[in-house]
């Protein structure tokens, strides 16, 4: 970057702005770096995003093809073996976890996601900053090339921000990655856009101060449209990034939710105003609007009560019932007309008459069957909507409410029937995400040889939340299903003998040997490492629970990948260990 001053080749950047020599230098510098040539920086920013999506799209196609072919013919060849080894190396590093303190800076916990964001940031910063022309000789010669580059790149990121904001979005459709897992990238793209926007602003301020001091800067902010129109979108984008931090969302979630979409609309409108059709940058905004609007319309017509079917604009009746005294209750929706879901998916529920503007995601604890099984949700009262509903139940024990269903969303595009070994691990109400996998595998034909269901609960009476479902799965699945329950609390209202007697009294021919119940807080690391010797060729691990549990499981599964890429050394026949984590149900 050249040294700055108030003159250029003997010309004062302000006093000589109308001279012939000044105009000559202006045309000369514009010819060196034409203003319109900067549009390529926006295009290559979009190309980078499209290339990333394409790689994820190919990955989804391969996995679906591999699952389908393996389900019909359990065999591998040299080509698939090489791919399996390459994938295991990627998972070995990708599943590893970063130190917890880094997540406070909105850095994702997994090494894989963090590495992608680092490389993306490196690409964008180098592409923006490395071209050595940052400024022109005088501000009057034309906008700073650095400012134009950064502004166009920030605008090019806008379509990705709005696409990733949708629960039903085009990127999920193409990649199979659910929106809640893409939310990290939604936040990252917003922060990247904000940083580029700041880089876009700095050269204008710097040159104005260098050439004419604060009075010159003040005059431009007062009289120049390009200056004063850029203030609102920059402030709004900064607020959107700051208020999206996890610690703020946890404290004032409902306030964040409603403020976020309102500021998102305001940001879009003010940015269109600021762009003012310059350099065709508004094309990116209209593209963002097209994706955004399409996604919203699709969600309204296919996922909500506006879906054109028998339940159009109608609520569904739900039965609510307390499950013990620990703030846990269940919601059962009997009428599931028009709603189809897969294991591991969740819905947003909006309760009529109870904070109607609020809705929350809850994992579906039941499976979708031909006889239209009811939707069951197990909810732990936290605060806000869930606490309000529980307080009403505290007086009534059971209650009926009208509820609007928005969903389903989430889950995994992998087919659990295509794995020979499935491990389901959950804590507390996280069982709502793993139980549907157990039920689905118990009731359908598949190549699965063994399903290990591991559930960690605080109290023994918590097992009653899904006791009947577990008994049915054990009866249907027989010896291929192992149910192992860990009761963390040593003291409980029920004794082990009392619970076993209740199981024996059921007409399911179950006894204490069918379910293994241990007492005391277990070591998840030890549980998974002990399973290493009994893994099959293709293995799927589903984990649902607290962030600390998911971090621990991810780290262990990362280590287990060595059974794949070192199978010749350890003499294992393991070809794949796939991990799927769920965030909802807590």
Language-model segments: what does each one mean?
Residues 37-51, 82-301:
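Membrane-embedded alpha-helical bundles of multi-pass integral membrane proteins
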Residues 2-31, 181, 265, 377, ...:
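Reductase modules of NAD(P)H-dependent flavoproteins
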Residues 1-22, 56, 60-101, 374:
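Extended, low-complexity, polar regulatory segments
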């Amino acid at each position: 970057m050249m040294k700055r001053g108030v003159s250029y080749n003997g010309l004062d950047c302000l006093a000589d702005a109308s001279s012939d020599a000044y105009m000559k230098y202006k045309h000369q510098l514009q010819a060196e770096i034409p203003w319109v040539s900067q549009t390529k920086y926006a295009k290559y920013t979009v190309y980078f995003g499209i290339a990333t999506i394409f790689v994820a799209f190919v990955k989804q196609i391969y996995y679906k093809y591999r699952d389908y072919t393996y389900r019909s013919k359990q065999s591998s060849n040299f080509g698939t073996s090489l791919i399996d080894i390459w994938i295991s190396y990627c998972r070995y590093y990708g599943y590893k976890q970063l130190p917890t303190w880094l997540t406070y800076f909105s850095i994702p916990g997994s090494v894989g996601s963090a590495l992608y964001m680092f490389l993306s940031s490196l690409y964008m910063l180098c592409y923006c900053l490395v071209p050595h022309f940052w400024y022109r000789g005088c501000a009057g010669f034309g906008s700073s090339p650095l400012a134009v580059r950064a502004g166009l790149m920030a605008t090019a990121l806008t379509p990705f921000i709005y696409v990733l904001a949708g629960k039903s979005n085009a990127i999920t459709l193409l990649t199979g990655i659910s929106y809640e897992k893409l939310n990290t990238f939604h936040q990252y793209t917003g922060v990247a856009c904000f940083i580029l926007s700041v880089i876009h602003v700095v050269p204008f301020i710097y040159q104005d101060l260098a050439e004419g001091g604060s009075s010159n800067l003040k005059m431009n902010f007062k009289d120049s449209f390009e200056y004063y129109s850029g203030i609102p979108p920059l402030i709004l984008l900064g607020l959107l990034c700051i208020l999206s931090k996890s610690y703020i969302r946890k404290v004032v979630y409902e306030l964040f939710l409603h403020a976020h979409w309102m500021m998102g609309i305001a940001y879009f409108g003010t940015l269109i105003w600021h762009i003012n059709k310059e350099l065709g940058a508004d094309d990116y905004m209209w593209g963002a609007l097209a994706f955004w609007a399409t996604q919203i319309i699709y969600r309204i017509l296919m996922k909500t009560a506006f879906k054109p079917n028998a339940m159009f604009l109608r609520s569904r009746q739900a039965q609510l019932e307390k499950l013990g005294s620990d703030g846990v209750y269940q919601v059962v929706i009997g009428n599931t007309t028009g709603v189809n879901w897969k294991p591991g998916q969740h819905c947003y529920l909006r309760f009529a008459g109870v904070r109607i503007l609020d809705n929350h995601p809850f994992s579906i604890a039941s499976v979708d069957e031909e006889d239209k099984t009811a939707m069951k949700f197990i909810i732990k009262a936290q605060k806000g909507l869930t606490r309000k509903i529980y307080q009403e139940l505290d007086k009534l024990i059971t209650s009926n409410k009208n509820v609007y269903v928005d969903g389903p969303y989430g889950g995994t595009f992998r087919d659990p029937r295509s794995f020979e070994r499935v491990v389901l691990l959950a804590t507390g109400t996280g069982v709502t995400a793993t139980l549907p996998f157990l039920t689905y595998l118990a009731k359908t034909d598949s190549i699965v040889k063994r399903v290990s269901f591991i559930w960690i609960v605080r109290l023994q009476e918590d097992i009653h939340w899904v006791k009947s479902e577990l008994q049915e799965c054990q009866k249907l699945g027989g010896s291929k299903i192992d149910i192992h329950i860990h009761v963390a609390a040593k003291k409980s209202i029920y004794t082990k003998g009392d619970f076993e007697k209740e199981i024996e009294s059921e007409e399911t021919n179950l006894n204490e040997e069918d379910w293994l119940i241990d007492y005391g807080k277990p070591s998840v690391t030890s549980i998974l490492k002990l399973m290493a010797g009994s893994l099959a060729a293709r293995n799927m691990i589903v984990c649902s629970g607290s962030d600390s549990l998911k971090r621990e499981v991810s780290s262990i599964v990362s280590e287990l990948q060595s059974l794949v890429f070192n199978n010749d050394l350890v003499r294992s026949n393991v070809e794949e260990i796939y991990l799927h984590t769920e965030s909802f149900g807590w």
